[in-house]
Amino acid sequence: MTPFMTEDFLLDTEFARRLYHDYAKDQPIFDYHCHLPPQQIAEDYRFKNLYDIWLKGDHYKWRAMRTNGVAERLCTGDASDREKFDAWAATVPHTIGNPLYHWTHLELRRPFGITGKLLSPSTADEIWNECNELLAQDNFSARGIMQQMNVKMVGTTDDPIDSLEHHAEIAKDGSFTIKVLPSWRPDKAFNIEQATFNDYMAKLGEVSDTDIRRFADLQTALTKRLDHFAAHGCKVSDHALDVVMFAEANEAELDSILARRLAGETLSEHEVAQFKTAVLVFLGAEYARRGWVQQYHIGALRNNNLRQFKLLGPDVGFDSINDRPMAEELSKLLSKQNEENLLPKTILYCLNPRDNEVLGTMIGNFQGEGMPGKMQFGSGWWFNDQKDGMERQMTQLAQLGLLSRFVGMLTDSRSFLSYTRHEYFRRILCQMIGRWVEAGEAPADINLLGEMVKNICFNNARDYFAIELN
């Protein structure tokens, strides 16, 4: 019987153990996509307690707690921090088989140093007190944890209208060497069907000093904000494409669509597709000219529970996997961007694992001369960010493309404790390659495979995003 979560956790061959301990474990972290609040990094936030750093805002945990019958007041409601933590501690023993069980105990181990102890109601007091004592120390502040975890770069997720004042404050602080850069997330600028679109256009017009009436005005406003982001070191964009759409339109049609929407009219699905296509093609060309990377997160079915959406708002754990086809529209969108050779470096993520092979083959259609891995099939996302999901994504990438050119893991998280997801990914990567070697499917060449592992863990992302590190 193998003990739970030893130093060789998941490393079930000797070759995997060598790969992990000698090549993967000590690689720095290049976390190119996350949702950390830049203000907390700028002010070097001190966490009040274990709830504050671990449960607050974590919709993964809330979903598990609801499934365990926990009352909503103990998830997102007015219960005390300790009551919410106790509700989580009572849920954890029921999460065996869910990645939350592994994540929980990896996060207790690093950075808190708690090993050989499982979170449950019987250990809740001890773990709460021990972690809170550590959180009072300087090296457990927001910056302190990032430094402990050997982070070199994080890319936050930021709206085009954001001032980026906190990024500027961080950049001026020469004592803090981790790169904290904004990522451009323009969803509100192209989701023309949303009720909030007109208000957003007013805000975008205000910050860009542009009166947005025609499509060219929107392009001008977005270009000004792209320049603002570039001035703060941005090299990455991200887009939530819940449904991939494609429909072409001329400028007169786009002007009409925008004008009618600003006048409060409801658009047809075809008109929505025309507008979204035009914005994405325009933005893609801008990214290509600037050497940016674009990311498409495809296939979420959001806000399914309308009652809870009205009570609690979005992003609180009521989203799931969509099953709408995407291949043809995605192909047309990428091909349109590529017509003038202005398809930027692109990472494609799918939420439905059914679409893994769709993306794994799609990227091969648009690779770039002289640019290894220009088109990337992104790491297992959200519901696929677990052992089976990562294995599936990497196996299919290896079979359909070049795993060796993969830019690897990202946390996509709102928590400063989520850096152990990089460790989890690295262990799974080494386990997978070790099994290939054990089965005679890959050569037992530690130098060849060790270098490949180092590249996937850090070097490929560093080179792909072309961000100068401190």
From Swiss-Prot:
Gene induction: Repressed by LeuO and H-NS. Part of the uxaCA operon.
SUPFAM superfamilies reported for this sequence: Metallo-dependent hydrolases
Any one biological process term the GO annotation gives: D-glucuronate catabolic process
Class of this enzyme: isomerase
Keywords, sorted A to Z: Isomerase
Molecular function GO terms recorded: glucuronate isomerase activity
Pathway: Carbohydrate metabolism; pentose and glucuronate interconversion
Catalytic activity: D-glucuronate = D-fructuronate; aldehydo-D-galacturonate = keto-D-tagaturonate
EC id: 5.3.1.12
Superkingdom per UniProt: Bacteria
Signal sequence annotation: none
Sequence similarity: Belongs to the metallo-dependent hydrolases superfamily. Uronate isomerase family.
Name of the featured protein: Uronate isomerase
Gene: uxaC
